[in-house]
A protein has these predicted regions:
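Short, Lys/Arg-enriched N-terminal segments with co-localized hydrophobic residues
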Residues: 7-20
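Non-catalytic interaction-recognition regions
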Residues: 20-115, 131-611
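Secondary-structure boundary elements
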Residues: 113-128
Length: 611
């Protein structure tokens, strides 16, 4: 029995399935039915345990007999022989032989099952995907601030959100992709003040800069100027904390925020203009990385939402008011703490806004689930959000789910913004494309491409390397991004998988499988291993959707590519030892290429036809 990736997904193989009945589920159903017929009493799949057979024993799946023998009052040997004989006799197309070792019934799957699986699915480009479930899921991701360009952390967020949405869609869910633009607040005003002070009327057009980078430079400039002014105040005997509040440029930003909230025309005009520059820049980046949204919410439109819910919560007794007029909720009985929902001056806090927006989104889309793709520094916030919504008996409450993820770091350390040392998304993508160009040219296989084809190829490989590296890691884990490692054509990388796909396509351009074929020659070990690995694809998609975890897809597709690489290094296709073997292997090639293209597609990664 093939090992490695199969064992990794053992627990999922034995879960309830979808329209693609996995071998594991088929086995459980068959064994349950057989036990009931053999012993004339009811059985369920909870009466026995199924595992994959350990490498040192013969077989594919193992039935643990100990729980059965108590019910049957038979020895393991007797029960195993009766069940094994029944299965191999009544279902010869499914089980070819069995053996019993110390209370374990090891079953070997009939080779005809694997061949039939290949024959049935090798041309199906949608293999593993499910029909509509009639349930809607919202995935909110990206959520940028409109005072700076996207950075490396945003890339992980975008890739994770887009991929999670694609995986859920493949499982039959109706998907709504949304984004919340954080387009108001003191951080936005800082860029606006700096532009007023230092830009001299400069624009992205006049400087030849991308709009989000242009505005981001003024946010950095604000931080630089603030630091200078604070140092002057400290030198004059003012404490640092007071100096940071009293610095003239900070006071200007605070006044800018007051003027914005008051609707001062010239401030609103500047705010709209600078935001439009940023959105134009975002659009270029989003198009480049493939991110898209069905609806964008703007904080400037939603920040007042939820205020009526505070009054509702007070009347309901969920919230309480302190002497200073501020409104809170006491969550200490739930293992949390007290949380403010309205300041003493009557203004809303972020939590209040999020409660209001959750209600708005539910009213607009009636989603069964609302997934927030946000970094793990907000874990507590979303625990509180869901809990408050539940205590308010809001219909949106049960569907709230925080898809938390860890920070992305580089060897140089954690990313920062105020100091201007952030790793911009555009710069990172450019670097990856340049590295892909260098690596591809080193292979010496680019002479048959036009310049336009090469540009597209370098973009595809570079962006594919970046996406795969960021998605191959469990979202919950903090990760270290290594550009050089991510583009290794021989490693656990996107380019390796892309190369395998291109190699298969090269084979299929020269030869295609004949429509009709009959196979009698036994499968060789690597042929069987490849089919066994591909059989799991529907289960892996389902697992990735259940866990909201694209790394399951990334790990699986790599396993498929690696298994094919081992197979191809040992066995010829076009010049196979017989026509029967040639037809079988062409089918293996076609199904492998389809699964790689499908799986990488769920990660948002293109696979070239040629490399």
């Amino acid at each position: 029995m093939p090992r490695g990736i199969v064992v990794k997904y053992r627990s999922v193989l034995l879960q309830p399935r979808n329209i693609y009945m996995s071998l594991a589920e088929l086995l459980r159903n068959t064994v349950t039915e057989s036990l009931s017929k053999l012993y004339q009493q009811p059985f369920s799949d909870k009466d026995f345990q199924v595992n994959q057979t350990k490498p040192e024993f013969e077989g594919d799946y193992t039935i643990v007999l100990f729980s059965l023998i108590k019910k049957l009052k038979k020895s393991p040997e007797a029960a195993g022989n009766e069940l094994g004989t029944h299965l191999t006799t009544v279902y010869p197309h499914l089980f070819s032989r069995y053996n019993i070792i110390k209370g374990f019934l090891n079953l070997s799957v009939a080779e005809s099952y694997w061949v039939e699986l290949l024959q049935k699915n090798y041309t199906d480009g949608n293999y593993g995907k499910q029909p509509a479930k009639g349930e809607r899921v919202m995935v909110e991701y990206s959520s940028p601030n409109t005072n700076k360009p996207l950075h490396l952390g945003h890339l992980r967020n975008n890739f994770l959100g887009w991929s999670a949405a694609a995986i859920l869609k493949a499982n039959g869910y109706d998907i709504v992709k949304t984004c919340i633009a954080n387009d108001r607040g003191i951080h936005i005003c800082k860029s606006m003040v700096a532009w007023q002070l230092f830009a001299n009327g400069a624009t992205p057009e006049s400087t030849g800069m991308k709009g989000d980078h242009f505005v981001g430079d003024y946010y950095v400039l604000f931080g630089t100027e603030l630091k200078k002014q604070v140092e002057v105040l400290i030198a004059g005997g003012i404490e640092k904390e007071a100096a940071e509040k009293q610095a003239p440029i900070m006071l200007q930003a605070q006044q800018m925020l007051v003027d914005w909230e008051a609707g001062k025309p010239e401030v609103i005009e500047l705010w709209k203009k600078m935001n439009s520059w940023v959105y134009a820049g975002f659009d270029v980046t989003y198009k480049r990385i493939g991110s898209d949204f069905d609806k964008t919410y703007y904080e400037s439109d939603t920040y007042l939402l939820g205020k009526d819910l505070v009054e509702f919560g007070l009347k309901k007794g969920v919230f309480f008011q302190k002497e200073d007029g501020s409104v809170w909720i006491d969550l200490t009985a739930d293992g949390l703490d007290e949380k403010i929902v309205r300041r003493k001056d009557g203004t809303a806090v972020y939590m209040t806004q999020d409660i209001g927006l959750a209600v708005k989104k539910y009213e607009e889309y009636q989603c069964n689930k609302s997934i927030y793709v946000v970094g793990n520094e907000q874990d507590y916030h979303f625990k509180v959000l869901k809990l408050i919504c539940r205590k308010l008996d809001l219909p949106a409450a049960d569907g709230i789910f925080h898809l938390s993820y860890g920070m992305v770091e580089l060897p140089s350390g954690r990313m920062k913004t105020r100091e201007g040392t952030v790793v911009d998304a555009d710069d990172m993508i450019d670097e990856m494309v340049n590295v892909s160009k260098q690596k591809t040219e080193e292979l010496g296989k680019v002479k048959d491409f036009t310049s336009d084809e090469l540009k597209e190829l370098y973009d595809t490989i570079g962006l594919g390397a970046l996406k795969f590296f960021l998605l191959r890691v469990d979202p919950k884990k903090k990760m270290l991004f290594n550009p050089e490692e991510s583009i290794d054509f021989q490693g656990f990388t996107g380019p390796f998988i892309q190369f395998i796909h291109a190699r298969i396509k090269s084979i299929l351009r020269k030869e295609t499988a004949a429509p009709a074929a009959h196979f009698t020659t036994p499968l060789l070990p690597l042929e069987k291993e490849l089919i066994v690995t591909m059989e799991q694809y529907p289960v892996i998609i389902e697992q990735a959707a259940t866990d909201y975890n694209p790394s399951h897809i990334a790990n699986y597709v790599y396993a498929v590519a690696k298994t094919f690489s081992s197979f191809y290094s040992e066995h010829k296709v076009a010049s196979a030892e017989s026509e029967e073997k040639k037809q079988l292997r062409l089918r293996l090639c076609q199904m492998t290429a389809n699964i790689i293209a499908s799986g990488m597609g769920l990660l948002g990664i293109k696979v070239p036809e040629r490399m």
